[in-house]
Amino acid sequence: MKTKKWNWISTIKINELYFDKIYLDYKKILDEPNANIFSENEDIYDSFIFEENGINSLIYFEKNGQFAGMELKNNLFYKDINLIGKDIEEIKKIFGYDSLVLDKYDSVDCDDIRAIFWFENNKIESVTVY
């Protein structure tokens, strides 16, 4: 799990973890002292929290081992552009959106690219990719 850079191809993969692929040994992927079960959401997901460069991030697997996504707070790259710290106008340009509007949770849900952008002080604080 330790990496300096998370390379995301929307709807397909992040680094070598493919969305919707089943990893029967997914707990081995997290086999490190700083990856701990964060929560179990009913019978749907196992969520693991791991620390990377002093920042907590989350990874999700469905109970059958299917990779369901991640929430990352640092070093998330899309086409060699680090998304963390970008403002909403920059996100519109990067992804070709005409308009994006923050919801009441200071987030933007972009179903077409399977991402939720979480903002704080008008800058991306984290991104959930699924």
Show where each model-derived region lies.
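Short helix/turn-capping signatures at newly exposed starts of structured segments
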Residues: 1-130
